[in-house]
Design a protein with these regions (language model features):
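Short, basic-rich loop-to-helix N-cap that marks the start of a DNA-contacting helix
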Residues: 46-56, 65
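Short amphipathic helical patch at the helix-1/turn junction of helix-turn-helix
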Residues: 8, 19-20, 48
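Conserved hydrophobic/aromatic packing and binding residues within compact polymer-binding modules
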Residues: 14, 28-29, 39-42, 68
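A detector for short, charged/polar N-terminal pre-domain segments
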Residues: 1-9
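Short C-terminal boundary/hinge segments that cap the last helix of small helical domains
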Residues: 62-69
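Recognition helix of helix-turn-helix/homeodomain-like DNA-binding domains
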Residues: 33-47
């Protein structure tokens, strides 16, 4: 799997979990301390985020990092 494929898969998983929990993209971005447009880029696999940001998203979703990879 390429890096781009991993970023896309990660973003899809973030979106799946967010929607399953009934959280809007805007609300998740706010909870994770991320700009809403940046969160959209993450969900579309357009941003190669830091591990710190990944953990902030996980904390906001109340899940473990392995749930997204």
């Amino acid at each position: 799997m390429t890096t781009d494929e991993r970023m896309i898969a990660f973003g899809r998983r973030v979106r799946e979990v967010r929607k399953a929990k009934g959280i809007s993209q805007e609300r998740l971005a706010e909870m994770a301390g991320i700009d809403r447009s940046y969160m959209g880029n993450i969900e579309r696999g357009e941003k190669n985020i830091t591990l710190k940001k990944a953990y902030e998203i996980c904390d906001a979703l109340e899940i473990e990092i392995q749930d997204l990879v």
